[in-house]
Amino acid sequence: MIVPLLHVLILAGILFVLGLTCVLVWRSNIIMMLIGIEIMLNAAMLAFVGGANRWGAADGQVFALMIIAMTSAEVSLALALVVYLHRRKKTVNADEFSDMKG
């Protein structure tokens, strides 16, 4: 069964809005912001794959693989930074990390 492109794009839009809401609502928690960004990137990946399926091109799948590689690198680096900052400040509150020494 082939899913219509409109349904795929509606689902991608809903996922993107949910990810954006997650980023905007939990601005103080770095881990929740990271989860929201990942949801938004997955929505973009779904839109690419749906469009590629509609037009019969492999470009969407290639972009999806690139997004998967980029997000895995992003998550590993971001979580390493969060663990480091949590060890130093004992919190994951983003407002605590914006203070500069000076």
From Swiss-Prot:
Described function: NDH-1 shuttles electrons from NADH, via FMN and iron-sulfur (Fe-S) centers, to quinones in the respiratory chain. The immediate electron acceptor for the enzyme in this species is believed to be ubiquinone. Couples the redox reaction to proton translocation (for every two electrons transferred, four hydrogen ions are translocated across the cytoplasmic membrane), and thus conserves the redox energy in a proton gradient.
Catalytic activity: a quinone + NADH + 5 H(+)(in) = a quinol + NAD(+) + 4 H(+)(out)
Organism the protein comes from: Geotalea uraniireducens (strain Rf4) (Geobacter uraniireducens)
Keywords: Cell inner membrane, Cell membrane, Membrane, NAD, Quinone, Translocase, Transmembrane, Transmembrane helix, Transport, Ubiquinone
Enzyme class: translocase
Protein name: NADH-quinone oxidoreductase subunit K 1
Major site of localization recorded for this protein: membrane
A Gene Ontology term for the protein's cellular component: NADH dehydrogenase complex
Membrane topology, as annotated: Multi-pass membrane protein
TM ranges: 5-25, 30-50, 62-82
Compartments where found: Cell inner membrane
One annotated GO biological process: ATP synthesis coupled electron transport
EC number(s) reported in the record: 7.1.1.-
Secretion signal, residue range per the UniProt entry: none
Subunit and partners: NDH-1 is composed of 14 different subunits. Subunits NuoA, H, J, K, L, M, N constitute the membrane sector of the complex.
One Pfam family linked to the record: Oxidored_q2
Family statement: Belongs to the complex I subunit 4L family.
Any one GO MF annotation of this record: NADH:ubiquinone reductase (non-electrogenic) activity
Gene expressing this chain: nuoK1
